[in-house]
Amino acid sequence: MKNNSIRTVVATGIGAALFIIIGMFVNIPIFGNTSIQLQYAVQALFSVIFGPITGFFMGFIGHALKDGIQYGNISWAWVLASGITGLVIGLFGKKYDVTMGKFSVMSMIWFNLAQALGLLIGYGVVTPIGDKIQFAQAWSYLYAQSFVAGVANFITIAIGGTLLLAIYASSRTQSGSLTKD
């Protein structure tokens, strides 16, 4: 258990650092303060490989630090939504266990259903309500911004996350594939 805890902490730290760096330097603005951000594909990879705790804290810590550094202001609802997305993807990790060298079509479907659920909770519920509480913005703007971000993140994870997981799975040795000479 102790070894697993160390692994989780190290993966979380590395993941949060990647979240910050990718989020600050690789983003494409699309609406308001919303942009296509590729760090969510990397977060999905870490969530699957290292589990839901790493996925949550990678998104939560990484997003909080990124916003604090980049904007000088932290939108806690969006930070929580990033964490929730990683948590949900990681919770369903057994459905698409890529560590065994396989990432089947059914695994891809489960992965994308899990990320859709995480994004729906995070960006369909948490961000609009949290921003209403924190910033008192108009509901129409909050839901529009959350919808655009959720869809952008879904597409990013569906393409980038699926590709990263497929590449990772192909780099693993499949169970039972080695034979004794």
Swiss-Prot record:
InterPro entries assigned: ECF_substrate-spec-like, UPF0397
Main location: membrane
Compartment list: Cell membrane
Topology relative to the membrane: Multi-pass membrane protein
Keywords: Cell membrane, Membrane, Transmembrane, Transmembrane helix
Record-level GO cellular component terms: plasma membrane
Transmembrane parts of this sequence: 11-31, 45-65, 72-92, 109-129, 147-167
Domain of life: Bacteria
UniProt-listed Pfam families: ECF-ribofla_trS
NCBIfam families with a match to the protein in the record: PRK13661.1
UniProt similarity note: Belongs to the UPF0397 family.
Name listed for the protein in its UniProt record: UPF0397 protein STER_0346
Organism: Streptococcus thermophilus (strain ATCC BAA-491 / LMD-9)
